[in-house]
Amino acid sequence: MLVYTSGTTGKPKGVMLSHRNICANVIDAVCGLELSQNTVNLNVCPLYHVAASVFQTLTTFYIGGTSVTLEKFDPQHVLEAIERERITYTFLVPTMIFRILELSNAEEHDLSSLVKLGYGAAPMPLDRLKKAIGLFGPILFQGYGQTESTANICILRSEDHDLEADAEKLERLKSCGRDHSSHEIRILDPDGLELESGNVGEICVRSSSVMEGYWKDPEKTREAIQKGWLRTGDMAYMDQDRYIYIVGRKNELI
């Protein structure tokens, strides 16, 4: 499968994802999220994005579940679909969740079927997170990943969204989670040496989900995959419990 990146560092690149890459990520998602044939997925994000195409749709099909796709995002239509189709699983970006929370009739909908609500691309402010949990229940999780890694790399699980936890654990809500299933994650310096916890370096990933390379661009492929490690371009630090805190993109830091 050929999927193009968003082009945040320039011209979009064609990412070559193999059958092996996709299967590895799908199996990780099934095990990590405890999905089953009773899963009813709602696609709101565009299918040209790996979050919707792989992490949601193909994962649901792999286990024999049901997948429902909306033509476009509309906060009212999302709530209506969850209620009508008895959706159990969906994935949204924070701005979508914010728009749903702004609806005056949001609490009038029966959302009790929903057991997994993922969000990604950015952390959520604590006040918005409280409102989201108040509406949907304690079912939110955050996912971090890239097209080059066939979607998710790490997850901040629902149990990490405990708003009654102590200050140290609440700090984890600023992270994007930790290692997801078979993904091996390291924070490396420019020379490829692993950094100790608390030190900022580049998030690097090694797993069966890492892409085959960039379409017709061997030079960019060599830059991205070094000694088996995908260099994500995201700068972060890891705490002692392996939670990862992103601070910016590699080419944006001074």
What do these predicted ranges mean?
Residues 5-8, 41, 47, 82, ...:
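Conserved S/T- and glycine-rich ATP-binding loop of Class I adenylate-forming
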Residues 64, 82, 90-93, 192, ...:
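Residue-level signal for inorganic ion chemistry
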Residues 87-92, 101-171, 184, 194:
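Gly/Ser/Thr-rich phosphate-binding loop
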Residues 174-179, 183, 191-198, 202-254:
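Conserved ATP-binding/catalytic segment of the ANL
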Residues 13-16, 43, 65-72, 141, ...:
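Short beta-strand->loop structural element characteristic of the AMP-binding/adenylate-forming
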Residues 1-24:
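Conserved AMP-binding A3 loop
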Residues 23-40, 48-89, 102-104, 158:
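Conserved AMP-binding/adenylation subdomain of ANL enzymes
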Residues 1-4, 11, 34-40, 181, ...:
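Conserved pre-ATP/AMP-binding loop-to-beta segment of ANL
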